[in-house]
Amino acid sequence: MVTWNGQTVLLNWATAEEIDNYGFNLYRARVDDFSLAQLIHFEPSAIQGGTGSGATYRYLDMPPVQGTWWYWLADIDTQGIQTVYNPSVAIAVQFQTQIYLPWMGKR
């Protein structure tokens, strides 16, 4: 699940079971094209030894500019093989800005 809170993008995911799982890579791009995506984060497996029950994960991302961003999750097994999960997830990011104008009044 991906949500925008006005300042950061929150990415949440969960696993039912992790067998031989080393960790996860998160990727981000401005378009829905994985070949243009950049690795933004590695999250190690929360399961000791890469075997056992599942876990929940979260990552806070701060996109450099507003617009639509696409995210991909990939898992890496203990042999170093990466599996990218589709579909990608898109979210529109719009920074909230406040403009302060000087107060001008009659004296």
Put a short name on every predicted segment:
Residues 23-66, 84:
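Recognizes extended acidic, P/S/T-rich segments that occur
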Residues 4, 15, 27-32, 75-77, ...:
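Residue-level signal for short segments within beta-strands and strand-turn junctions
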Residues 5, 16-20, 65:
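Short glycine/proline-centered coil/turn motifs in the loop regions
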Residues 61-81:
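Beta-strand-rich modules
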Residues 76-98:
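Extracellular fibronectin type III
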Residues 7-11, 22:
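Structural beta-strand segments of beta-rich domains
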Residues 102:
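Conserved functional hotspot residues at active sites or interaction interfaces
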